[in-house]
Structures are given as C-alpha cells and as structure tokens.
Amino acid sequence: MSTFILALLAGAMRVVTQSYIYSQEEYYYKLAQEAGEAGTAYANACLDSNGAEQSWGSVPGGIGPLRPETNCKGAVNPSYEKYVFDEGNKFRTTFEVGDLEASTRSTALSAATAQISSIGRVEITNGSGVVLKTYTAVVKKSVTWPADIDATRTVSGTYRTCAILSNNVWCWGNNDKYESNEYTMGQLGDGTTVSSNVPVKVRSVGDMRNGKIIDIFAAQFHSCVLTEFSSVRKIYCWGNNQFGQLGNGDFGDGKYSSVPVEVKPPTGALAADFAGNNISAIGGTGDVSCAIAAGKVYCWGSNTMGQLGYGSPGSPKSSATPVRINSGGYSRLPNNYSATKLSTGGSRSQTMCVITTEKRAYCWGQARFGQLGIGVPHYSGYGNATRVKDLEDVTDISQDGYTWSGSPDYVTHTCAIAAGRVYCWGGAGRGQAGSPGSGTPKKHIEPRLVGGLPGVALQVEVGIAHSCALMNDAGTKKVYCWGDNRLGQLGANRTDIQYSFTPQPVNVGPNGLPASERVVSLSAGANRGCAIMSDKRSYCWGLNDNGQIGDGTSGSENNRFSPTESLFLRPVQNRYIY
C-alpha cells in the first residue's frame, strides 16, 4: 500500500506552469496550496487502506503526523522521498497532516466523515539547502463515504485510460512518445509530457472550469470532452495534433497540446449547427474526432482512409476544423438523416460509424477487411457513410483495431446490437468476430451473428482484438467477452485460453465482479475492458503495462485475467481523489 500511496502523491503533485501565474508570490502560494492538497490526498489514501480509521498522529499505534517521507502510521521510511517536489537549488515543497478534526473512529463506513487539515509548505533555498523563505497554506477538506457513490464513466485510448470523476477529467498511462512514434503527445492533458500510472487531473480550461462535463472519448493519442455551461455546449481536445484532430485550426508533424484546447466551430451557414446546446455527442477513432451537432455528423483530423466522411480518401488529407460528412446517394446516409449515436472504441482504427433515428447503422473509412460491413472490401477506404448491410433496429455500435498503421489489419473489426442480438464483422482471425471468417487473413465482409450469448444484448464494446457484451439473461445482467485473451482481455480468469471464438463469461465471485451487485455498463478499448457495477464501483481487466487497470500496479507482469477493482475509479461526493 505504501508504494501505491507514494505513486499517488507523484500523480497528485503536478506543478502548474508559469503562464498561469501572475506573479512569483502567487506562484509559490499556489504551490503551497497544491502541496497541502497532496497531503489531503495522502490522508484519504491512508483512510482507505485502514477502513476509514485514522492510523497516524496521536491514535493508538500512530507514530507522528503524515509527511511525504512517512508511512500511514507517520513513521519515517528512508526509501520515501522527503519532499513532494524538489526543484534542486531553487525550492522544494512538503506537507504535514495532523489528527483528524472530526474522527471516523467507531463509525460505520457508509456514514463516516472526517475533516482533514493539511499544511502545505514551499521552502525557498539558496542552493546549499539553507531555507531563505517559507510560504504556507492550510488546506481543509471534508471527506465523506456516503452510501450513494457518484457514478463514473471511463474510456480507453492507446496505453492510457481516462475517466470523469466528480465533474473533473482524470487520465493515467502513457503521456509521451510510444514505440516508434517520434512525436511527443501530451495525451494525459495535465500540462506535462510525463507518463503516470496514477491519475492526473486534466487541466480545466474555458467552460471546463465551471461547466458540466457531459461526454468524453479517448482515441489513439488524443482525447476530447463535451461541456455545457449556461446552455452552451463546447468541445475541448488535447494530445496529438499531427492531423488536426484537436480541431483548433492547427496541425502538422510534432504538433500537440498537453492541455485542452477548444474546437473551433465551422463557419458560414454551418456555424448554427454548433450554436447553443446543439452538440449532442462526440466520438473519435485513431487520428480523427467527430461530433453530432443539430443531428448532423461533423469530423476533423486525418482523412487518409476517408475517415472524415468528406471527399475522397486522402483528398483532403486532413482537416483541422470540423467538416460535415457527406450524405445522399445509393446505400448512403440520406440527406434528411438525423444522427443519434456515434460508435465507441476506435483507439487505433480508421473507421467511424453512426446510428440514425431510423435505427440504421452507417460506417465510413478503412474498408480493406470488411470492417464497414457493406458486403465488399475496399483497400483505399470509403469517404462516404454507407449503410451496414441487412441490420435493422440498431441500438449500439463499437469498432476498434490496428488499421492506423496498416498492420496487422486482421484484428480490425466492428460489432453492433440489432434487435437485441450481437453481430460482428471485419477481422476475425483472433476470434473477435465470434466466428472464424474466411479468406487470408480471416474476415467477415458483412455482419455475422455472434452465437453463444444468452438473453438480450444491452451494450457492446470492442477492443483491438476482443469484444464484450452486456446481456440481460432472464432479468440478470451478465458480461461475456470473446477474441484475444493473451493479455487477459476476456476477464474470464482463464490463462489457458489464448483465443476464443465462443463468448466466455467474465468471472464473477471473490476474485471477479461482485456477485451481490448488478452490472450497469461496460467500457472497453485497446486490450482491456471495464464494468461499472450497481454500487458505482468499477472493475477492469486485461493489459496493465502502463497502469491502465487502476489498482495501483503497472507492468505487463500485472496484467489482470479477472476483473480487478479500479480503486482510482471510486469517486464519492465531497471526496477528493488524487
């Protein structure tokens, strides 16, 4: 637990940049405030680990106050860092947390309360360790554990996870260059390019400060949120901007933003679509972002495979501001369409889909391996939204895969719910489509029914090479997954299965989803999945190389083959999580 808390502090304490500080004095007081908040975060974590009981200070067994270099009993640990932040010969920050002002001792967890008082300090030094001046700030936080815990939404990009917690956005995982990519990304949105296996708060800008966070998506190396303030909705994006996927009018090799930037609305006659609260949904895939505004679909970013749904693949190559996708023509979106939902997933794919009010699905973009579901493959992609073949009464759709790099394409696929049943198409070689497929590589070019799923499908989510569905089986909600399981993506607690064409039940019980709670919703992406339960706690499984699971561990040796509670995803009203 101590290692986890140290990591938690590292994620909690991110120095704000000078551009947001009006004077040096304000800067140091701001740092003192943040150091104090890091102390309240530490106290929260210690309370969590000790059943809401104070373990430091003057209580039995307590050694002293909480400081960065102490454990939860207040005892100094030589292996811990002495300061929250140490800027060498300039300044350093620390905190001290004393006894709780309202004790939680002998109080039921469902009603426990505490007043945490933390003193944050900034010590200005002369380069030799001598303190020249000290700035202090006292931070007091009321902490509660009510029975009704706030709901949360999680999304998974490539090697990172993001969540909406108490109307703030938090991300964790990779935040810089990855593998062969030569460009810095900043996809955690906290103003740095430092990766973190604990949540860091995405910088709140514009209407993110005072408005409501309505929606979020995480694509390959960028993310976006939809906000509403004073009945006006806006979109903010951060991360990689090589192809204009942030929508702020800028793009180019090496372009990125480590803090959210506002998406520029279209101009001219189309500007009205983005006015007021007309934006109803956002979504993204690979290096493209999309939104539904006034019932119409707009996209911005890369168009190499037609994923803008505008013009021909590669013409234009990209757009740094929203463009309305094409409509009209045989088997395409009708001119008078009204969109209701964008496809989820898509951390690495070059395909997008939309559901209309007629409950029909239309897809566009990369089509080489049948992932559009239109009955024919097409190497160069489709720049027009085309109807998915033979599906009626479509209520949900999700897509993901590897086509951003061109290989391995056989893992690219799409799944949808039609009339309560799950259908999948596209790449099928690892079982992700629920049946083997044909050709080389194995694929389905039109929807195929996934067998072995009991009851009525409520939600479908896909990752790079696996799929999951939430089923209502005679009144009981159950999660099933199929496809690649080498990293634990199926959550079935089965290390003996590498690939499965047959849906496997996600593990339920002491080492899985709690049997006493209902599954409320799913989220998936890349090589993992998550389920939100009726007690509003989240459980995730699969790849954990960058700490994406959220249980305080990281590294491929900590991949989870069974659902594991994501402690970071336990927001509570009036409770601060860092």
Where in this protein do the model-derived segments appear?
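Eukaryote-biased RCC1-like beta-propeller repeat architecture
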Residues: S142-Y578
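Beta-strand/loop motifs with alternating small/hydrophobic and polar/acidic residues, enriched
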Residues: M1-W145, V572-Y578
